[in-house]
């Protein structure tokens, strides 16, 4: 029996490829940049399975032109780059890698919070680029003043796995925790003393606003001009969720006009971020290249989970992290 063919859209950990090779003929796109759409389309036409990343556009046009394709295994929690509804209609399974990046993303969120609150990147540049040397100030009582976190209010927008872990760390810093989410989290309220707020009140009260929402039609540009104007002038906005949750133009205006004090961003509406983008001009903005999950431990777990989803499918089993559960009614798993 001919083995199914999987196209892996980027170099991943060899352990994952080794596992895949036991069940699939594996082809890997070995360039650092993602495959161009036309290349991806060409590969999909010949593939039984795709191993994808958020940077790959898996739209209905591509799915419709891939007659052999049975499963798309995404190495990410999010899957807004995939037309899941179309995939389900065509009997194509879609999987993701939930849960494994909670710790890494929460830790990185706190790295951003601390960097923005204590002006760490500014301080590094101040020393590295010679400004401290030129000023000959030594220690100065008014130099690089930031803000303490103890006693401040941490607002969590999206109290899922990551948001709740960020809140837990915030509690250890002695912060007051408030949150807005689709549903009340009674257990977290009890454990952390967290208080539920409407979105408007969350924005008004937060000293640090940390965003942990998936991107949907409802959350796209959820934070725009009117929302940013509700925030404190001393507030810091942190986004490790999805870039398009925040209207970038509105955020630039808010920073330029002083509606908020600072921002720390790991995700953007357009990635990679153009080095000439207005956001890069602000000293009070910390920028990172969508790196919140970038620890060796987490990325290996993600790579293996995506591979394990593909292996389960090849064995005729429903993959453990199936996104579109209703697809089972359209087609049974396996090749």
From Swiss-Prot:
Superkingdom of origin: Archaea
Swiss-Prot/TrEMBL keywords: Cytoplasm, NAD, Oxidoreductase
Binding residue positions for NADP(+): 159-162, 181-183, 240-242, 290-292
EC class (word): oxidoreductase
E.C. no: 1.1.1.26
Entry keyword Cytoplasm: yes
Subunit note: Homodimer.
HAMAP family cross-referenced by the UniProt entry: GyaR
Protein name as annotated: Glyoxylate reductase
Organism per entry: Aeropyrum pernix (strain ATCC 700893 / DSM 11879 / JCM 9820 / NBRC 100138 / K1)
UniProt lineage: Archaea, Thermoproteota, Thermoprotei, Desulfurococcales, Desulfurococcaceae
Gene: gyaR
